[in-house]
Amino acid sequence: MLTKPLQGPPAPPGTPTPPPGGKDREAFEAEYRLGPLLGKGGFGTVFAGHRLTDRLQVAIKVIPRNRVLGWSPLSDSVTCPLEVALLWKVGAGGGHPGVIRLLDWFETQEGFMLVLERPLPAQDLFDYITEKGPLGEGPSRCFFGQVVAAIQHCHSRGVVHRDIKDENILIDLRRGCAKLIDFGSGALLHDEPYTDFDGTRVYSPPEWISRHQYHALPATVWSLGILLYDMVCGDIPFERDQEILEAELHFPAHVSPDCCALIRRCLAPKPSSRPSLEEILLDPWMQTPAEDVPLNPSKGGPAPLAWSLLP
């Protein structure tokens, strides 16, 4: 049976389609209100906010112009940051429930403001694991399957994320589902090797460490192996470059042989030995019957439901 998330939550009512060109600061202030700081990253700063017409809660990513690493044409007359173009591509036609959606974007004198959906309550997977420790194989399988399906969608739209890690997985605590966020390190998908990498080094594959080049698909699978290890073990397997090159894995006793085997497949030192995304979903460990994800968004809140997996 194929492990695959069911249809995700519907789009917020009245969600606008991003315009072909970014609007200016005055237009932003007429439509949205900027709220408190949520976090800072290498490519921008993220604030809470809301839409004035209906008070829809959103995340607003502010990117200084000098932090834009790549540009892309949206039309014959409009050029935008590559991150906007990538989000536009993965969000076209309703997007995917496992990928964060770009609702709007604006260009200011200082840079760009990206308005993104913001499920509430939510927590990134790094904080979730830090708080709870190893997730157990049931929740890990559920979240991991959703992330793999989200990446499949991105690749089908010609987009490679290039920074798959726990901090870039947002957990919707009410629904028990995972969303891929932050395409700041992303690129257009192609078959030729990539010779640049702006992602997180401890998630990077050995071929990048040794040769400073990699292919999109096996590098993505490597980072998925790191992510799954993090979920079931509570921490990443490698910290130093030499550890990445040696790829020597040690598992706690509670991790099942089937789970260990899938992680070892994903973290094969030779890129051609790693499975495809489709093969990951067909792996015996991924075929284990699904179970609900035990989340606790807040005291007194409704019991969240995990996405089921199709038989």
UniProtKB/Swiss-Prot annotation:
Post-translational modification as stated in the protein's UniProt record: Autophosphorylated.
Signal peptide: none
Quaternary structure (record): Interacts with MYC.
A GO CC term attached to the entry: cytoplasm
Source organism, top-level taxon: Eukaryota
UniProt-listed Enzyme Commission number(s): 2.7.11.1
Protein name: Serine/threonine-protein kinase pim-2
Family as reported in the entry's similarity comment: Belongs to the protein kinase superfamily. CAMK Ser/Thr protein kinase family. PIM subfamily.
A single GO BP: negative regulation of cell population proliferation
Keyword Ligase annotated: no
PROSITE patterns linked to this entry: PROTEIN_KINASE_ATP, PROTEIN_KINASE_DOM, PROTEIN_KINASE_ST
Keyword Coiled coil (UniProt): no
Tissue: Highly expressed in hematopoietic tissues, in leukemic and lymphoma cell lines, testis, small intestine, colon and colorectal adenocarcinoma cells. Weakly expressed in normal liver, but highly expressed in hepatocellular carcinoma tissues.
Main EC class the enzyme belongs to: transferase
Active site positions, chain numbering: D163 (proton acceptor)
Chain positions covered by the region annotation Disordered: 1-25
SMART domains linked to this entry: S_TKc
One Gene Ontology term of the molecular function aspect: protein serine/threonine kinase activity
Gene that specifies this protein: PIM2
Chain residues that bind ATP: L38, G39, K40, G41, G42, F43, G44, T45, V46, K61
Ranges annotated as biased composition (Pro residues): 7-21
PANTHER family cross-referenced by the UniProt entry: SERINE/THREONINE-PROTEIN KINASE PIM (PTHR22984), SERINE_THREONINE-PROTEIN KINASE PIM-2 (PTHR22984:SF10)
Keyword tags: Apoptosis, ATP-binding, Cell cycle, Kinase, Nucleotide-binding, Phosphoprotein, Proto-oncogene, Serine/threonine-protein kinase, Transferase
The protein's role, per its UniProt record: Proto-oncogene with serine/threonine kinase activity involved in cell survival and cell proliferation. Exerts its oncogenic activity through: the regulation of MYC transcriptional activity, the regulation of cell cycle progression, the regulation of cap-dependent protein translation and through survival signaling by phosphorylation of a pro-apoptotic protein, BAD. Phosphorylation of MYC leads to an increase of MYC protein stability and thereby an increase transcriptional activity.
Signals that turn on the gene: Down-regulated in response to enterovirus 71 (EV71) infection.
